[in-house]
Amino acid sequence: MQFSRIIVYGYPRTGSMWVYNILREIVQLCRYDIIPKRIPKSDKEMLKIHKNNLDIKNKKIISIIKVHTLLDKYQLKDAFIFMTKRDPRDSLISYMRFMKVKNLDITRKLEHISSYIDSVKHLRNTINSQFFLEIDYKDITLRPINLIMKILNFLKIDLKEDQIIDISKKYSKDSVKKMIEKKDLNIKKKLAKNKKVSNNEVVIMSPDNIRAFDENTGFQSNHVSNYKDGDWNDILTSDEIEEINSKFEAWIEFNN
């Protein structure tokens, strides 16, 4: 591969975790060693790994990180960059559900969408397009095999058809949901019996919000939801929709 670093950037709830795992599978099938071996829980940990590997000399080692934090030009140098994108009205509602935020005023909703748009603009203005691939959330959900082939083409990597199908099945919505639900049930059983739970098994958001965590993939409880794109139409109030669309609809329509 041309570069020994791959960076996946995604605003929360835009599909970056799926892309991250697809890339890890691809790189391992090509017989590269990947770092990190286990998935960190935070951007801070991810960025520490990235910083420590800015000057990798071993061409058989590939550093792959996923962040929500915007990086500067130096941090983005000599790397393949993948950015996931989604209608920010959908990512907003999905984020609120994932974080169990029931009440978010319109000001903070507008800030969420504005921040998403700023992040997209930042990356588009910072990165050499030759090494930058934008990934639409709809392709993740509707055309995963075609998307995997697109990623392979971008990286100039060939895999067999059955390998591509296997990757797609492994990270299908149903497969990931079953995997994390199994871990979630195991954590709940341990807690119910007052058994010790390893820090590597959970993400503690609050005493009432403890999520199972899979350190092999980074997926957490409720990472896969039953939310359907477009549901924001039925969840946001008519006044909220009017205000959001008056500010952002033109940009959203042009960029989605």
Task: Annotate each language-model stretch with its function.
Residues 1-6, 10-12, 124, 157-256:
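PAPS-dependent sulfotransferases, especially Golgi type II membrane carbohydrate sulfotransferases
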Residues 1-64:
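PAPS-dependent sulfotransferase catalytic core
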Residues 71-79:
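Short loop/helix-cap segments at secondary-structure boundaries that form the rim of catalytic
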Residues 93-166, 174-180, 184-187:
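PAPS-dependent sulfotransferase catalytic domain
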Residues 78-96, 244:
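Conserved phosphate-donor/acceptor-positioning beta-strand/loop module used by diverse small-molecule
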